[in-house]
Amino acid sequence: MKKGQVDIITMGCSKNLVDSEKLMTLFEQTGYHCTHDAKRIEGEIVVVNTCGFIEDAKQESIDTILELVQAKEEGKISKLFVMGCLSQRYQKELEEEIPQVDKYYGKFNFKQLLTDLGKPEEPTCSGARHITTPHHYAYIKISEGCDRRGAYCAIPIITGKHVSRPKEEILEEIRELVASGVKEFQIIAQELTYYGVDIDGKRHIADLISDIADIKGVKWIRLHYAYPNQFPFELLDVIREKPNVCKYLDIALQHISDNMLTRMHRHVTKAETMEFIERIRKEVPGLHLRTTLLVGFPGETEEDFKELVEFVKWARFERMGAFAYSEEEGTYSAEHYKDDVPAEVKQRRLDKIMAVQQRISAEIEAAKVGSVLKTIIDRKEGDYYIGRTEFCSPEVDPEVLIKATRRLRVGAFYDVRITDSDDFDLYGEVE
């Protein structure tokens, strides 16, 4: 056990990661040494930032807490704290079931942890925040919460209403990170395009991204988690006209069958969705679309699923993820629908839709062979440098593998000629 060391473990999404990074910054400003997701827990204090999105994520968070409770009982750690989405939603139950945790915090009051440890009463995250990602990219969370009430989604229950961060606060954070060496920014929110609505009733995401793009030193900006309904199309002008805004957009569509879209409370139709995709393709040629689909939602018929498969073949998404429906307590679907699609059918549909997408992705990546793409180097693994193009977000998208025949700098950009591809990745040589 290392005195003065705090080990922070983050479960779940990149929005949780940003919260962990902010907490690490506060700890370090008050004299602690922090590690993140260390393979070996050695700190006297451990903080688990939990996920409460779906059942598997909840169980993973609980299992992690229980492992650390055992470590505490064995004297390997002194203090154990829990924060994040799971404890935001189930704090009382967790306190009753796992009382060995020193204290539970929610998603928004984790700064109180410093006060409880006898540190400054109102700590502030001044200066560039600690980042746990490679030094050249960072996630920027522009809002909290969500006003969308999808029938299946527990996130609004956990995070509350949408609250936009002040624009100048976001811009200042990015300036500080640029000064510390960050070049690439992943702009994230539960609903990106809703930014500003809670401030004056208008969507200001296009203006915000344009202002970020104008900051000297910002090389790449990538946009995650938009929504098709009431999409602000002026954002496409910014993506098309600003060279440092990546031609990449992450929009969760979930389904295409009007039956499913209605039951899911998506407030968009099949026809509107297809028109939306066609307009994006037309207004920003070459843009790569990432989406997420949901199979096995209550009431999904074989016809609904076949319609979804045909839609995937038509849309030819460059990037796509999918997951099987999991009933979440407190949601509209859990309270009003019977979870009537058998688990084996959900899995079969999930496997099928991903197999269709894998073939599409392989064809799209193969078409890049022979082209020269600007690539940022993320790391070196064995005999290869691993990089990404503007069309690839960290962790979730294909990578570019470059044989390490010469020394390349991590965080630097290179023009890479693509020489080969497989089902997942590209291979290339520096020009």
What is each model feature region?
Residues M11, R149, C153-G160, W220-N229, ...:
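Conserved strand-turn element in the central/C-terminal portion of the radical SAM core barrel
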Residues G52-A57, V182-D211, I215, Y227-E234, ...:
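Conserved glycine-rich "GG(E/T)P / GGGxP" loop and the immediately following alpha-helix
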Residues D200-A213, F233-K247, E300-E318, P342-R348, ...:
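Short, electropositive alpha-helical surface patch
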Residues G150, I170, I187, L223, ...:
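Conserved, mostly hydrophobic/aromatic
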Residues S333-E431:
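Terminal RNA-binding accessory module
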Residues M1-Y195, E234, V245, L249, ...:
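Proteins enriched for Cys/Gly/acidic motifs involved in redox and nucleic-acid/cofactor modification
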Residues A179, A206, D214-I215, W220, ...:
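Radical SAM/AdoMet-radical enzyme domain recognition
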